[in-house]
Regions:
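Ser/Thr/Pro/Gly-rich, low-complexity intrinsically disordered stalk/linker tracts of secreted
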Residues: 5-492
Length: 492
């Protein structure tokens, strides 16, 4: 069997009325030049009472345990099923199904050619847009048996509010998977299919997405298992690119979760989870950031702005490893730089409720609390995320500190929003200010620019000499810090 192929075995079990029990299904695979075989067991409940709507099992596995590498994702799930009059059907027809991956796993729709919405609807997508393969089983088959089906999965032009989109096919037509980054504290990659067909309801699906689609160029399934050639196909491309990348965090990972609702009970979701194998090799990930920080005025003892520019190289080479994700970044301003009381007196504050940390809700911070602008670049998006920096309410912020700020950056077309809290500490002996961003999202950030306003909205004023230090550190099994210093003399 080729990687991604599915072998389906159905076993009929006769159960006496009033009996509830369970059986264990066990499977073992060997060969393929593997050093050792692999085994798995799955316990299935057997009952004379029909199952209610739900997902009986979920599996999400990766092709490599190397952190930050190009990996294939294979995920499979089965809806609870009933047999009536010899016909297999789901306990209820699924309406929406969504898969959330652990933080740090990312897909880059910009790295692969896209299929137009029209071509996707008519099943005429070019091979270059293929990024995976799906094997499905649906109801209403011949003689009441489930209908097996196989299809390539295509990278599709997204709609407004989507990071990306994928299209696969059932006998009755296409299914669209919407890709997005959840606007919560973990910023997980989410794949969701809405309004699934009820004419031929979905029973099960096994989906494989390729880390490097060009590596799977071949015949592949064309709505039927291929009789010759590889078990599945892929795009041909002159320069292979990375579509799917594993997280840059080592050790135990959060579970992948799948939620689903039904047409008979919409918005009533069931949820199952699947543990993911731990990743390793974080110390191998490259991390070579550069940063510059400078005031934007040349007059001392005046409310000043600051320009912070952070850049992290991001390689799309599928044979290499991705850069480690930025975890923390801090900037320590020079001695003598203090809070500009004249400017701060005219500012308002943004509350935790106004900013809505960990929520996709719209930001309602007062305009008078805005103290700067922000821009974030990522290879996942064609356009940067842009937004504002707000002064947080003193002592009523995530740090309970007198000084803090909120950073909000959005890309509305892709539906991506990032909200961060930044701590501002004043050294009790020297008065030096340190601005720190902690636990940044596990996303590939290639650039981060912060501009703190000067003038009436400025929150800092300078002495005659400026010496700025800043450090940033990587995530992973071993933390690695980079520290830089810069100097600038102002007119007094």
């Amino acid at each position: 069997m080729a990687p991604g192929d599915v072998l389906r075995i159905e076993i009929a079990v006769k159960v006496s009325p009033g009996i509830t029990s369970s059986v264990v299904n066990a499977a073992t695979v060997t060969g393929g030049d593997a050093e050792a075989g692999a085994s798995v067991e799955d316990r299935t409940t057997i009952s004379s009472t029909g199952a209610g709507f739900g997902v009986s099992d979920l599996a999400a596995t990766w092709s490599s345990e190397q952190a930050g590498s190009s990996v294939n994702l294979t995920t499979g799930f089965t809806f609870n099923q009933v047999v009536n009059g010899g016909e297999t059907a789901p306990a209820a027809d699924a309406k929406e199904v969504a898969l959330n991956l652990p933080p740090g796993f990312v897909a880059n729709p910009e790295a692969v050619p896209q299929c137009s919405v029209s071509d996707a609807e008519h099943d005429t997508c070019p091979a270059a847009a293929a990024v995976g393969v799906a094997f499905t089983s649906s109801g209403s088959g011949v003689g009441g048996a489930p209908t097996p089906y196989s299809s390539l999965v295509y990278n599709t032009v997204p709609s407004p509010g989507e990071l990306g989109a994928l299209t696969l096919f059932l006998p009755t037509g296409p299914i669209r998977l919407s890709l997005g980054i959840r606007s919560n504290s973990d910023y997980e990659l989410r794949m969701a299919a809405n309004d699934l067909p009820s004419l031929e309801p979905l029973l099960s699906m096994t989906l494989t997405l390729w880390g490097v689609p060009a590596a799977y160029d071949g015949a592949g399934p064309d709505h039927a298992p291929a009789e010759t050639g590889p078990g599945f196909g892929g795009p041909g491309a002159p320069q292979p690119t990375r579509f799917l990348t594993s997280a840059g965090t080592c050790g135990a990972l959060p579970a992948s979760t799948l939620s689903a609702d039904s047409w008979t009970a919409p918005s009533v979701f069931v949820e199952v989870s699947s543990m993911t194998s731990a990743l390793s090799g974080c110390t191998r990930l490259p991390f070579d950031p550069s940063i510059s920080v400078a005031p934007d005025i040349s007059e001392a003892n005046e409310p000043s702005g600051y320009e912070l520019d952070l850049n992290i190289p991001q390689s799309g080479n599928p044979e290499g490893l991705a850069s480690a994700d930025l975890k923390d970044a801090s900037v320590t301003l020079p001695e003598g730089v203090g809070i500009s009381l004249s400017a701060a007196n005219g500012l308002q504050a943004c509350t935790e409720r106004d900013v809505g940390l960990g929520s996709p809700a719209a930001v309602t911070c007062p305009e008078a609390s805005k103290v700067g602008d922000v821009e974030v670049q990522t290879p996942l998006l064609a356009n940067p995320l842009q937004g504002a920096i707000y002064l947080a309410t003193p002592n009523a912020n995530p740090f309970g500190s007198p000084l803090a700020m909120y950073i909000v950056a959005e890309e509305p077309w892709a539906g991506v929003s990032i909200k961060l809290a930044g701590q501002i500490d004043a050294n009790q002996l020297t008065g030096q200010l340190t601005i720190a961003l902690r636990a940044l999202p596990q996303l590939p950030i290639s650039g981060l620019q912060l501009h703190l306003f000067g003038g009436r909205a400025g929150v800092a004023e300078h002495p005659c000499s400026v010496r700025v230090s800043h450090e940033h550190e990587r995530t992973g099994a071993v933390e690695r810090k980079h520290q830089r210093h810069s100097h600038q003399r102002l007119r007094c």
